[in-house]
C-alpha cells in the first residue's frame, strides 16, 4: 500500500501557517511513544523510534537546493507525548516547553488502540511558521502497523516542511508518475502563501509544478510555470535554469542561450552543479542554432567546473559526433557512463530528469542519468 493518501493533504488545508519567515525548518525533533496495550501487536519503543526516524530521514535525504533540517530523536515526554490515559488522548499536552525563545520544529507520533482499531496521534509545531497541530491517523484495511507509522511520520513532515515533503514525493513517484499527492500538497501549501509579488516559497512550489508538467509531457505549461517561478523570485537559479530548459523544448534556442549567458555572467560564484548545468544548457541552445564550435568551447567549461557531470560529457560527445570525430565522441560518451554513479544534480533541476534537446519539435524525453540515491528508491 502506498504510504501517502489524500486524507493527509485534506487535513493540511485546515492547518494555520504563519508566513513571516521562510517556510523551512532548520531543526526537527522527533518524539514517539505508545499508549496502552495494543492487541496482537509486538512493537516496542525502539522500533517506533526507528520507523519514525527512517521515514523522516528518507524525506530529508532528498538532494535539494533548500537547506535541510537537522533531525534528532527527542526524549520521550517533550512535546506532550506523555499521555494521561489511552482513553483521553484529546487532552494531549503538546505545548512546547522551551526556556529560550528558539523553538525547533517538532513531530510526535503516539501509537494507540481505540475500540479495537489501531491509530496514531500525530502532533507537532513549527515554531513561528506552523501552529501546534494534532491529527489522528487510522489504520486502513490491509495496512501494516509499520506502514501506518511511516504514513504518520510523512504526515508530520508534510505539516512542518511541505516543500521538502512534496519534493520527496515527486522523486518517489517519478517511475509510476502518480504525482497526485505531491500535486495536492503543493496546491494546498501555495494556498497558504500571501499573494505578494515576491515570494521565496511560492517560487519553489511553482518550479516543482513546472517539473511535474514536464513529466506529463506538457512543454507549454512547464514553460509557464518556470516563468512564474522566476517572476516570484528572480534569484531562484533553479527556475532560471529550468526556464531555459523549457525554451529548448519550445525550440526557442536564442532565448535559452541569452538566458544562460546572463545567468552565468551575473552569478560567478554559482554552485558547481548549477553552473555546469547552465553551460550544458547553453551548449544545447548553441547546437540548436548550429553553432557547433562555440558549443564545443562552452562544454569544455562545463566539464572544467564539474568533471563528474554525466550530461556534460554526454552532450560533449554529441558535439564531437557532429564535428565528425566519432572516436572522440565514443570516448566522451563512455566517460559519461563512467561518472554516472556520482551526484548529478539537485532535485529542483529539470535536467536531472529529462534530456536537453537541440532539435526542433522534440517530445519531452527522460534522461538516462540521475542521482545514485534516486536510483535506489525504485
List each language-model region with its residue ranges.
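Hydrophobic/aromatic packing residues within the alpha-helices of TPR/SEL1-like helical repeat arrays
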Residues: 186-190, 226, 253, 260, ...
Amino acid at each position: 500500500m502506498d504510504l501517502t493518501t489524500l486524507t493527509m493533504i485534506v487535513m493540511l488545508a485546515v492547518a494555520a501557517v504563519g508566513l513571516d519567515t521562510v517556510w523551512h525548518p532548520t531543526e526537527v525533533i522527533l518524539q514517539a511513544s505508545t499508549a496502552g496495550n495494543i492487541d496482537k501487536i509486538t512493537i516496542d519503543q525502539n522500533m517506533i523510534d526507528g520507523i519514525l526516524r527512517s521515514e523522516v530521514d528518507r524525506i530529508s535525504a532528498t538532494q535539494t537546493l533548500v537547506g535541510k533540517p537537522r533531525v534528532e530523536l527527542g526524549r520521550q515526554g517533550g512535546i506532550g507525548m506523555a499521555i494521561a490515559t489511552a482513553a483521553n488522548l484529546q487532552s494531549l499536552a503538546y505545548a512546547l516547553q522551551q526556556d529560550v525563545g528558539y523553538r525547533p520544529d517538532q513531530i510526535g507520533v503516539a501509537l494507540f488502540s481505540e475500540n479495537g482499531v489501531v491509530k496514531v496521534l500525530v502532533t507537532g509545531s513549527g515554531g513561528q511558521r506552523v501552529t501546534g497541530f494534532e491529527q489522528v491517523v487510522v489504520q486502513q484495511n490491509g495496512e501494516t502497523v509499520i506502514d501506518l507509522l511511516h504514513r504518520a511520520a510523512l504526515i508530520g513532515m508534510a505539516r512542518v516542511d511541505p516543500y521538502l515533503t512534496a519534493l520527496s514525493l515527486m522523486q518517489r513517484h517519478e517511475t509510476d508518475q502518480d504525482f497526485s499527492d505531491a500535486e495536492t500538497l503543493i496546491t494546498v501549501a501555495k494556498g497558504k502563501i500571501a499573494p505578494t509579488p515576491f515570494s521565496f516559497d511560492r517560487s519553489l512550489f511553482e518550479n516543482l509544478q513546472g517539473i511535474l508538467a514536464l513529466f506529463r509531457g506538457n512543454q507549454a505549461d512547464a514553460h509557464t510555470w518556470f516563468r512564474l517561478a522566476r517572476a516570484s523570485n528572480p534569484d531562484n537559479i533553479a527556475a532560471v535554469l529550468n526556464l531555459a530548459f523549457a525554451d529548448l523544448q519550445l525550440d526557442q534556442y536564442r532565448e535559452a542561450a541569452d538566458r544562460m549567458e546572463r545567468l552565468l555572467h551575473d552569478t560567478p560564484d554559482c554552485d558547481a552543479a548549477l553552473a555546469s548545468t547552465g553551460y550544458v544548457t547553453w551548449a544545447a541552445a548553441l547546437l540548436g542554432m548550429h553553432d557547433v564550435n562555440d558549443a564545443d568551447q562552452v562544454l569544455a567549461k562545463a566539464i572544467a567546473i564539474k568533471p563528474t557531470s554525466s550530461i556534460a560529457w554526454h552532450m560533449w560527445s554529441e558535439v564531437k559526433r557532429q564535428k565528425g570525430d566519432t572516436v572522440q565522441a565514443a570516448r566522451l560518451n563512455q566517460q559519461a557512463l563512467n561518472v554516472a554513479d556520482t551526484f548529478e544534480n539537485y532535485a529542483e533541476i529539470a535536467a536531472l530528469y529529462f534530456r536537453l534537446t537541440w532539435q526542433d519539435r522534440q517530445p519531452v524525453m527522460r534522461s538516462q542519468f540521475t542521482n545514485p540515491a534516486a536510483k535506489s528508491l525504485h
